[in-house]
Amino acid sequence: MTPIYYYRNSAHPYNRSHWGDVAVYWRPSTEFTGNVYKGEGLVAGKPEDVWECLKPEPGGLRVKWDNNVQDFQLLETVTNDITICRTVTPAAAMGIISPRDFVDVVMIKRYEDGSITSNATNVEHPSCPPQRHFVRGFNHPCGCSCVPVPGEPEKTQVLSFFQTDLSGYLPKSVVESFFPYSMTQFYNNLSKAVKSLNV
């Protein structure tokens, strides 16, 4: 069972907030002392177009539109669908959150219904120890899913799941306000990126 499948179908209750067409849910994580966050939103675009903007790859579109991703680096290709990557994130929350980096094993999975998922979790890699100028954060099982909308081929339901340990000395209030806000921006910027593909 992939992390996306588990959190998508989890019966555990979530707290919920709405920002426009985007819903963000959260509850305490079972992986670490923070929260697991779930986002849901409809994006105007075919699943393959949305995936083209979302997929985690060096030199891809993601670094151009996602304000929370500064760089993707491929550390190792395990199989065609499994890689180990380093993600660099910029400072955030008016500089309170300093630049971070994350090393994850990433698995891409396609389903018969046309859904595409990206599943990731933290891992250590000998070529990428903690580095100066970055706080090493840890992604617990997380990812994104592009799900076709029945009867509406030009729309995609995007589900996102994050349970990220930012590490360092950060006030809990900063972390808990940062993630819901950044997730709504994620959906807004993704929608703009997909739209620009078809201009």
Question: Language-model segments: what does each one mean?
Answer:
Residues 1-199:
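Eukaryotic helix-grip
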